């Protein structure tokens, strides 16, 4: 599923002329929230339930440069859902050629913000995520 669409702006580029790694992370983070919303982890769910999601591991692989003016999209999929853990993959690509510029695999834990400890995902979230594993 497409979880982010945007462009590479000149101010996001470094002295070498390509998008700086800071911006890859930022765009992947925006994709996180769209992916979460698709399985029921919405802003209201997080606020009203006093829940959170914390990344515990993030691996980014850079495959090709993105330059100012490149239109990009991120496609995401869930790799695994467990009682308290979700693992997913983002692929950032140029919208024009569909060439993958970077991938980001993240493992995250569901949190109870009151106790500051991990807690199980609700059944509805687990079921929605399981339906999208692929």
What is the meaning of each model-derived region?
Residues 1-73, 79-134:
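Terminal targeting signals and extreme-terminal segments of soluble enzymes
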């Amino acid at each position: 599923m497409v979880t982010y669409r945007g462009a590479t702006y000149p101010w996001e580029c470094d002295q070498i002329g390509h998008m700086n790694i800071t911006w890859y992370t930022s765009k992947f983070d925006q994709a996180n929230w769209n992916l979460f919303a698709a399985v029921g982890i919405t802003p209201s769910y997080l606020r009203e339930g006093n829940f959170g999601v914390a990344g515990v591991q993030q691996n980014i692989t850079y495959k090709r440069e993105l330059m100012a003016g490149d239109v990009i999209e991120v496609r995401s999929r869930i790799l695994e859902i467990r009682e308290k853990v979700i693992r997913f993959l983002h692929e950032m690509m140029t919208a024009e050629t569909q060439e993958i510029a970077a991938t980001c695999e993240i493992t995250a834990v569901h949190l109870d913000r009151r106790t500051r400890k991990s807690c199980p995902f609700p059944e509805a979230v687990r079921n929605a995520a399981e339906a999208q594993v692929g």
